[in-house]
């Protein structure tokens, strides 16, 4: 690409509420567990995932939720004007464990 595109701000591409699927305000909520009646603290933080590799997102960078690794990769890619070539079929799987295996496909997922 000749430049870079910034995605429109809006609902996050990869938003997943915490595991119990209940939105909680900015506070922790106490809930009793059904077994033994003990109290447990549920986290109020909503988990967001990187739109590129699906790792945990560190923040909203360049218009999408992304991890620190993909944020830095995208920044280096647009500043260095790199021309990456996919050694396979331009359809490599980019996830947390394989995000470093193909820079061309990783950059393509950034756009």
From Swiss-Prot:
Any one GO BP annotation for this protein: positive regulation of DNA-templated transcription
Molecular function per GO: nuclear estrogen receptor activity; sequence-specific DNA binding; steroid binding; zinc ion binding
Keyword entries, A-Z: Activator, Cell membrane, Cytoplasm, DNA-binding, Golgi apparatus, Lipid-binding, Lipoprotein, Membrane, Metal-binding, Nucleus, Palmitate, Phosphoprotein, Receptor, Steroid-binding, Transcription, Transcription regulation, Ubl conjugation, Zinc, Zinc-finger
Species of the source: Ovis aries
Any one of the GO CC terms: plasma membrane
Function: Nuclear hormone receptor. The steroid hormones and their receptors are involved in the regulation of eukaryotic gene expression and affect cellular proliferation and differentiation in target tissues. Ligand-dependent nuclear transactivation involves either direct homodimer binding to a palindromic estrogen response element (ERE) sequence or association with other DNA-binding transcription factors, such as AP-1/c-Jun, c-Fos, ATF-2, Sp1 and Sp3, to mediate ERE-independent signaling.
Composition skew (Basic and acidic residues), residue ranges: 19-30
ZnF NR C4-type: positions: 50-70, 86-110
DNA-binding region: 50-111
Main location: nucleus
Comment field on protein domains: Composed of three domains: a modulating N-terminal domain, a DNA-binding domain and a C-terminal ligand-binding domain. The modulating domain, also known as A/B or AF-1 domain has a ligand-independent transactivation function. The C-terminus contains a ligand-dependent transactivation domain, also known as E/F or AF-2 domain which overlaps with the ligand binding domain. AF-1 and AF-2 activate transcription independently and synergistically and act in a promoter- and cell-specific manner.
Annotated compartments: Nucleus; Cytoplasm; Golgi apparatus; Cell membrane
Pfam families hit by this protein: Oest_recep, zf-C4
PANTHER family: KNIRPS-RELATED PROTEIN-RELATED (PTHR48092)
Region: Disordered, residue numbers: 1-42
Region span, Modulating: 1-49
InterPro entries listed in its UniProt record: Estr_rcpt_N (IPR046944), Nuclear_hormone_rcpt_NR3 (IPR050200), Znf_hrmn_rcpt (IPR001628), Znf_NHR/GATA (IPR013088)
Assigned protein family: Belongs to the nuclear hormone receptor family. NR3 subfamily.
Subunit structure: Binds DNA as a homodimer. Can form a heterodimer with ESR2. Interacts with coactivator NCOA5. Interacts with PELP1, the interaction is enhanced by 17-beta-estradiol; the interaction increases ESR1 transcriptional activity. Interacts with NCOA7; the interaction is ligand-inducible. Interacts with AKAP13, CUEDC2, HEXIM1, KDM5A, MAP1S, SMARD1, and UBE1C. Interacts with MUC1; the interaction is stimulated by 7 beta-estradiol (E2) and enhances ESR1-mediated transcription. Interacts with DNTTIP2, and UIMC1. Interacts with KMT2D/MLL2. Interacts with ATAD2; the interaction is enhanced by estradiol.
Protein name (record): Estrogen receptor
PTM-bearing positions, type Phosphoserine: 32
Post-translational modification, as annotated: Ubiquitinated; regulated by LATS1 via DCAF1 it leads to ESR1 proteasomal degradation. Deubiquitinated by OTUB1. Ubiquitinated by STUB1/CHIP; in the CA1 hippocampal region following loss of endogenous circulating estradiol (17-beta-estradiol/E2). Ubiquitinated by UBR5, leading to its degradation: UBR5 specifically recognizes and binds ligand-bound ESR1 when it is not associated with coactivators (NCOAs). In presence of NCOAs, the UBR5-degron is not accessible, preventing its ubiquitination and degradation. Dimethylated by PRMT1. Demethylated by JMJD6.
């Amino acid at each position: 690409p000749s430049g870079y595109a910034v995605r429109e701000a809006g609902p996050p591409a990869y938003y997943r509420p915490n595991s119990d699927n209940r939105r909680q305000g900015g506070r922790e909520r106490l809930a009793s567990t059904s077994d033994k009646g003990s109290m447990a603290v549920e986290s109020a933080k909503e988990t967001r995932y990187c739109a590129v590799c699906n790792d945990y997102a560190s923040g909203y960078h360049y218009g999408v939720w992304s991890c620190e690794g993909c944020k830095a990769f995208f920044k280096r890619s647009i500043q260095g004007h790199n021309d990456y070539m996919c050694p396979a079929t331009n359809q490599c799987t980019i996830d947390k464990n394989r995000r470093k295996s193909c820079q061309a496909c990783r950059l393509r997922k950034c756009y």
